[in-house]
Curated annotation (Swiss-Prot):
Protein name in UniProt: Large ribosomal subunit protein uL22
Quaternary structure and interacting proteins, as annotated: Part of the 50S ribosomal subunit.
GO CC annotation terms, alphabetical: cytosolic large ribosomal subunit
Species of the source: Phytoplasma sp. (strain STRAWB2)
UniProt xrefs under SUPFAM superfamilies: Ribosomal protein L22
Protein family (similarity comment): Belongs to the universal ribosomal protein uL22 family.
Length: 129
């Protein structure tokens, strides 16, 4: 049986990937109720953006794939580096330093815990043969 995964992607988010990964690591593997609570009370700049992305993935799962909301959990979430905007910062004697304004691509995948149970049962039955 093929597992159904709901996916949401936020591209070109103006948060450095290093800072976004701190928040993403908190919710990986959690069920959606726990993840929403964690993101609501996390005092980081990336938390509201990731919460909005989580809510989008939940809507995709419930409306498009008809998955049960109570059984959803965060299967995988990762942050990739996006574009780097290069800006000049003026320094002494007419010189300048480069400032790299970093962006992120955040990907969040959620699935139902019943999908996890059925895939584990298939693996166990396949290994016995």
């Amino acid at each position: 049986m093929e597992t159904k995964n709901a996916k949401a992607i936020a591209r070109k988010v103006s948060i450095a990937p290093r800072k976004a990964r701190l928040v993403v690591d908190l919710i990986r593997g959690k069920n959606i109720a726990q993840a929403q609570a964690i993101l609501t009370f996390t005092p980081k700049v990336a938390a509201p953006v990731i919460l909005k992305l989580l809510n989008s993935a939940i809507s995709n799962a419930v409306n498009n794939l008809k998955l049960n909301r109570e059984q959803l959990y965060v299967k995988e979430v990762f942050v990739n580096e996006g574009l780097r905007l290069k800006r000049m910062f003026p320094r002494a004697k007419g010189s300048g330093d480069m400032i790299k304004k970093r962006t992120s691509h955040i990907t969040l995948v959620i699935t139902s815990s019943t999908n996890l149970q059925t895939s584990k049962e298939e693996e166990q039955s396949g290994s016995k043969n």
